[in-house]
């Protein structure tokens, strides 16, 4: 799957920015203050949909964060959907101030994809990964490791975008989608992986090393 240099503002944000700019121009004919407020909102939306370039770690076996945000928890759990047994779950909360572009935690082939409708609880709730609307993407690395990522909608984030199809290949740190306006991203690693982050740690998508796959 191609990941050539993308615009600094994700294309999914352009309709919002365009609408707000048009409204701001029209509002100037009503009152300058209203136009200024709408122009400010347009700038905020542009900032929200920012898509900066990131230096991707290249060492073999590393797992990078799939999202910007803060680690909510790290747990050993059963994951029957794709991993097929015990797995290490890392859950990351994204506030509205974080970059919302998701990046692949590992290099591998997309062999599983599923959308699950659900609720829209606040993304910092521990149960959101089980009850909220979410989209799963499963990757198999060249070493045969199975890694699962979930994009979880939140109270405000009610639009999940996932670009790859089954059969596509992703590089480590490659963009694969986004979630709009505050959300949660989760990643399941093989149970014998080494997790290198703790709850409360700040992580950066595609850049922060959150774990190491077993040899």
Curated annotation (Swiss-Prot):
GO molecular-function term, one example from the UniProt record: phosphatidylserine decarboxylase activity
Cofactor: pyruvate
Active-site feature positions: 183
Chief site of localization: membrane
Subcellular location: Cell membrane
Protein name in UniProt: Phosphatidylserine decarboxylase proenzyme
Pfam annotation, one family: PS_Dcarbxylase
Lyase recorded as keyword: yes
Catalyzed reactions: a 1,2-diacyl-sn-glycero-3-phospho-L-serine + H(+) = a 1,2-diacyl-sn-glycero-3-phosphoethanolamine + CO2
Gene this chain is encoded by: psd
E.C. no: 4.1.1.65
Family to which the UniProt record says this protein belongs: Belongs to the phosphatidylserine decarboxylase family. PSD-A subfamily.
Pathway: Phospholipid metabolism; phosphatidylethanolamine biosynthesis; phosphatidylethanolamine from CDP-diacylglycerol: step 2/2
Subunit description: Heterodimer of a large membrane-associated beta subunit and a small pyruvoyl-containing alpha subunit.
Any one GO BP annotation for this protein: phosphatidylethanolamine biosynthetic process
Keyword annotations of the record: Cell membrane, Decarboxylase, Lipid biosynthesis, Lipid metabolism, Lyase, Membrane, Phospholipid biosynthesis, Phospholipid metabolism, Pyruvate, Zymogen
Protein topology in the membrane: Peripheral membrane protein
Coiled-coil regions listed in the entry: none
Cofactor note: Binds 1 pyruvoyl group covalently per subunit.
InterPro entries: PS_Dcarbxylase (IPR003817), PSD-A (IPR033175)
Site (Cleavage (non-hydrolytic)): 182-183
Residues the record lists as Pyruvic acid (Ser) modifications: 183
Any single GO CC term annotated in Swiss-Prot or TrEMBL for this entry: plasma membrane
Function: Catalyzes the formation of phosphatidylethanolamine (PtdEtn) from phosphatidylserine (PtdSer).
UniProt PTM comment: Is synthesized initially as an inactive proenzyme. Formation of the active enzyme involves a self-maturation process in which the active site pyruvoyl group is generated from an internal serine residue via an autocatalytic post-translational modification. Two non-identical subunits are generated from the proenzyme in this reaction, and the pyruvate is formed at the N-terminus of the alpha chain, which is derived from the carboxyl end of the proenzyme.
């Amino acid at each position: 799957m191609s990941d050539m240099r993308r615009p600094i503002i994700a294309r999914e944000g352009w309709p919002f920015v365009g609408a707000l700019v048009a409204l701001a121009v029209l509002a100037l004919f009503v009152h300058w203050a209203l136009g200024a407020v709408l122009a400010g909102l347009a700038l905020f939306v542009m900032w929200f949909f920012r898509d900066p370039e990131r230096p991707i770690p290249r060492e073999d076996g590393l797992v990078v964060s799939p999202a910007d945000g803060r680690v909510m928890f790290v747990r050993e759990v059963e994951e029957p959907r794709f991993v097929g047994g015990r797995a290490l779950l890392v859950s990351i909360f994204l506030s509205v101030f974080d970059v919302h572009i998701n990046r692949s935690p590992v290099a591998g082939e997309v062999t599983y994809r599923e959308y699950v409708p659900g609720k829209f609880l606040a993304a910092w709730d521990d149960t959101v990964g089980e009850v909220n609307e979410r989209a799963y993407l499963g990757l198999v690395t060249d070493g045969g490791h199975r890694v699962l990522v979930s994009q979880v909608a939140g109270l405000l984030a009610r639009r999940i975008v996932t670009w790859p199809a089954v059969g596509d290949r992703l590089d480590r740190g490659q963009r694969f989608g986004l979630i709009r306006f505050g959300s949660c991203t989760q990643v399941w690693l093989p149970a014998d992986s080494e997790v290198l982050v703790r709850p409360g740690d700040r992580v950066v998508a595609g850049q922060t090393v959150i774990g190491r796959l077993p040899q």
